[in-house]
Each structure stands twice: as C-alpha cells, then as structure tokens.
C-alpha cells in the first residue's frame, strides 16, 4: 500500500533523471564494478556517469547517438556497455544481487525452486536473428526467463521467436546449473510438458495447468510470479521491442534491467 513513507522512499524527483543512480544505489553497486587499470590512459569519465548513461538508454529507449550532451560520448558509453556484455558483468552483477536480496529477505542465498516462462516481442529493422512465433503471431524474438519464487531473475535467454518453449527451455535449465546449482524444482506451463525438458537436467519440472473450469484469464499459482517480472522489466522503453542487432546485446539489456530492480530494492533496505 502506498503511504507517505513509501512514496518518500520511492521518490526520484531529486535526481537529474529518474534512471540515475542515487547515492545509496551507487554504494550498493560500486564494490562489484571493475577497478581502474593501473596502466594505460586514465578514465576520462566516472564509472557512475557511464552507468547513468547506460541506464538512461535502457529506461528511455533512446538510441545511443541521442544521449543528452551532459552524459559521456555515446561511443564511449556503448563501448563500456559492450565490454560489460562480453565480460559477462551484467550476468555476474545480477547473480550477486539476487543472492544479497534473498539474504536480505531472510531466504537462503541460492534458491531451491524457480519458475520459467517466455515472452515474444517484435524486432525492428536492426537485423540479427529472428523468427515467427506461430502461436502468438509475432515476428521477432523470444525472451526466456527463470525467476525464483519471489520473482528475482535467475537466468535470462533470448532466441528467435520461432524456437518453441520446450526447445528454448533446455539451454535455460542447463545454464542454471552453473550459477544456481541448488534449484531442485521448476514450475512451468503446459508448453514445457515434453520429454526433452524433463530430461534436460536433474531439475524436476512441475507443470502448473489451468483450472478445469477456467474461462478467460485467471491468476494461476506460481506462474504469475514470472509474468510479474516480465511486466516489471517492460517498463523500460528499450525493452518495449527488441531493438538490438545481436542476441548478446538483447540478453545484456535484460540483465541490466534486472540489476536496476535489485539495486533499488537493496538500496531502499539499507
């Protein structure tokens, strides 16, 4: 429930842009970022400003070239984004903050249960791999998400929309064993009811089916959590469609959106 106290904690009017990192959020994030190199040229721009620029692109949906002039140059900002992408830093930050936020909530750092689902989104003329989702009549890409039972993103994948859920779930489940090896059970809808999904890993896949008398939309147990996560990250206009030329960049923006959610939550609790 919104109260004057909660509104104050969520208020971002004091920042230059709503996407900028507050002092509390920067204190949460800074220890996990790569330190400056001891050799070579010094950084011309503070890392905090670089991340503010990246989050501005994510939140506003603007092209890199249209960054406001008080941010670092768009070439520099994009280069740091791709460096973080190629080094796996977005995924690493998400992993660290998921564990910290679970501990903050009194949970074990690594989850034992998760939920998976996908979302098909349209692409643009930027190119790159894409396909046609015949079920949802969408030409573009499919975002696959595995979240814990509170809705924190554990593993995120992007692939052409023509890949069926049961095929896209296999690499998602396999990837989860490296970062979250204690997941024992995954809840999913009937699209994942296939032998290849059940035998992909040692994880038990439990199918949450519609109610026998269900007509139209209904909130289903477990499954609504991943739907809520997808709705949260879609508030970022860069994710309204898939504008990226590569699957790697598309995935990196998903992790960046998850990181933004987690650091705000951790900062408010600190």
Model regions and ranges:
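Short alpha-helical elements
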Residues: 1-270
């Amino acid at each position: 429930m919104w109260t004057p106290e909660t509104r104050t904690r969520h208020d971002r009017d004091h920042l230059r842009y709503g996407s900028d990192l507050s002092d509390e959020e920067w204190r949460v994030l800074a220890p996990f970022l790569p330190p400056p190199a001891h050799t070579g040229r010094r950084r011309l721009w503070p890392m905090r400003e670089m991340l503010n620029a990246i989050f501005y692109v994510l939140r506003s949906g603007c092209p890199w070239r249209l960054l406001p002039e008080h941010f670092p140059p768009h070439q520099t900002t994009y280069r740091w984004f791709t460096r973080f992408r190629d080094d796996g830093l977005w995924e690493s930050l998400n992993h660290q903050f998921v564990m910290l936020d679970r501990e903050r909530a009194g949970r074990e750092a690594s989850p034992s249960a998760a939920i998976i689902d996908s979302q098909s989104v349209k692409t643009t003329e930027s190119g790159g791999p894409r396909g046609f989702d015949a079920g949802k009549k969408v030409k573009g890409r499919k975002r696959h998400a595995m979240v814990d039972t509170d809705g924190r993103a554990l593993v995120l994948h992007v692939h052409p929309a023509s890949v069926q859920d049961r095929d896209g779930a296999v690499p998602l489940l396999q990837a989860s064993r490296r970062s979250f090896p204690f997941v024992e059970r995954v809840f999913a809808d009937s699209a994942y009811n296939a032998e290849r999904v059940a035998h992909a890993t040692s994880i038990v896949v439990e199918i949450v089916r519609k109610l026998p008398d269900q007509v139209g939309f209904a909130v289903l147990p477990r499954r609504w959590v991943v739907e809520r996560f997808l709705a949260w990250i879609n508030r970022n206009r860069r994710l309204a469609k898939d504008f990226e030329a590569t699957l790697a960049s598309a995935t990196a923006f998903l992790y960046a959106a998850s990181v933004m959610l987690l650091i705000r939550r951790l900062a408010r609790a600190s």
